[in-house]
Amino acid sequence: MSVKWEKQEGNEGVLTVTVPAEEVNAGLDKAFKKVVKQVNVPGFRKGKMPRPMFEQRFGVEALYQDALDFILPDAYAAAVEEAGINPVDRPEIDIEQMEKGKELIFTAKVTVEPEVELGDYKGLEVEKEDTEVTEEDLNKAIEADLARKAELVVKEEGEVAEGDVVNLDFDGYVNEEAFEGGKAEGYDLEIGSGQFIPGFEEQLVGTKVGDEKDVTVTFPEEYHAEELAGKEAVFKVKINEVKSKEVPELDDEMAKELDESVDSVDAYKEKYKKDLQEQKTLQAENNMKESLIAQAVENAKVDIPEAMINTELDRMMQEFEQRIAQQGLNLELYYQFSGQTEEQLKESMKADAEARVKTNLTLAAIAKAENIEISDTDVDAELSKMSEQFGLSVDDIKAALGNGEVLKDDLRIQKAIDVLVKESKEK
C-alpha cells in the first residue's frame, strides 16, 4: 500500500491511498460471501449461487460497496499511521479507482490536530496563597455542616421567609388563558432556590399559610417555549403549608453524628481544623497550577479546528446531563425551568469548550517539548494509587479505563504541569 499526505491550508490535508489489487480482490471475496447469502435465484439454494454466474447476472459492481466496507477502515487506519497524522474528525473519502483485479485508489480529506506555537512556559510568576485556617474559617465550615443536618419543621405561624419550603398550588395564565405546564397542586418550592421564573419566589416572601395571591412575572425573551417567551403571566397561588429549617446545636452527640471518629466537640473541632488545613493547602496548590496553566495557555498560539470544539462540547453536554440527573432533573426539565434552549446552552458552553481544547493542546505540546515519556512503572504506580483511592482491584480499573494510552496521556499532562510548577517563580 502506498500513501501520500498533502498538507493544505490551516489544519486540512489530503491522503491519497493506493491499495494493492490482491487486497481489493480479497475484499471482493468477502463481499460476495456476504451478498450471496441474501440472493434468491431459481435453481440454486440460498447462498449457493456460483460466483461467475452472480457476476454475469448482477455485475461485479454489485459487490463494490460491500467490498469497500471491508477494505476502507483498515486501509484508512494504516494510512493515517504511516502518514504520522492525528485526525480529529471523520474523513471525507472519494473513490478514484475501484475495479476488480486493479488497485483501489482513494483520497481522504482530513482535519488534523493543529500544531501549537508555544510561548513562555518557564519562569512564570505566581502568588503564594495564605493557607492558615482561622477560627472564622472553622466556624463557617461548622455552620455549613450543621445546616446540612437541619430538619424541616412546620411553621404554624409567621410569614414565608428566604430558605423556607412552601407547599403550594398554582394556576398560570397568559392573557387570562391557561397554558400547558402552568398548573400544579401540592408543589414544594424552596424560596431562594431559583427553580422558578425570575421574580416568582420573591413575591411569596411575606405570605402566610392559607393566603391566596396573584403573582405576576414575565417569561424570559429566550424561553424554550416560544409561545410564552417574553410574555407576562399571572399565577394564582395558594399557600398550603410552610416549613422552616431548624438547625441543630453543636454538642458532643451532634459532633459524633457529624464525624463518627470523634467523641466530643473539642475533638471534632481539632480534627476538622486539621482537615480544613489539608484542604486549604491542596486548594492553594491547585490554584497555583491553574494560574500557571492559564499563563502558559495565554502565551501559546494555536488554530483550533471547529471539529475539536464540537467534540468537547458534546463531552461537556454529557457531563452536564449527568450532573443534573443527580439532582433528579433531565435536560427537558432543565430547559423548562431555566428558560434556555439546547442551542443556547451549547452556545453558553462554547467558550469553555474552546478553552479546554486549547489547554489540552498546550500541555501536550509542553510534554512533547520536554520529551516527557511515561514508563510502565509510572502506569503501575498510578494504577495502585487509583486502586487504593477507589477500593477497586487494579484489573477492574484497567478494564474500566480500556485503552491504556488514555492513562498514559493523562500522566504525560500531569508531568507537563509539574514542569510549570518546578520552573515557576514566586511573586
Swiss-Prot record:
Per UniProt, the keywords (alphabetical) are: Cell cycle, Cell division, Chaperone, Cytoplasm, Isomerase, Rotamase
Q: Name one GO molecular function term.
A: protein folding chaperone
EC assignment: the record states 5.2.1.8
InterPro entries recorded = PPIase_dom_sf, PPIase_FKBP_dom, Trig_fac, Trigger_fac_C, Trigger_fac_C_sf, Trigger_fac_ribosome-bd_bac, Trigger_fac_ribosome-bd_sf, Trigger_fact/SurA_dom_sf
Instruction: Spell out the GO cellular component terms annotated for this protein, sorted alphabetically and separated by semicolons.
Output: cytoplasm
Q: Which SUPFAM superfamilies match?
A: FKBP-like (SSF54534), Triger factor/SurA peptide-binding domain-like (SSF109998), Trigger factor ribosome-binding domain (SSF102735)
The PPIase FKBP-type domain extends over 163-248
Q: What class of enzyme is it?
A: isomerase
Extract the Pfam families matched here: FKBP_C, Trigger_C, Trigger_N
Compartments in which it is found: Cytoplasm
The record's catalysed reaction(s) read: [protein]-peptidylproline (omega=180) = [protein]-peptidylproline (omega=0)
Biological processes per GO annotation: 'de novo' cotranslational protein folding; cell division; chaperone-mediated protein folding; protein transport; protein unfolding
NCBIfam families per the record? tig (TIGR00115)
Q: What does this protein do?
A: Involved in protein export. Acts as a chaperone by maintaining the newly synthesized protein in an open conformation. Functions as a peptidyl-prolyl cis-trans isomerase.
Q: Family assignment? A: Belongs to the FKBP-type PPIase family. Tig subfamily.
Free-text comment on this protein's domains from its UniProt entry = Consists of 3 domains; the N-terminus binds the ribosome, the middle domain has PPIase activity, while the C-terminus has intrinsic chaperone activity on its own.
Name recorded for this polypeptide? Trigger factor
Q: Which organism is it from?
A: Macrococcus caseolyticus (strain JCSC5402)
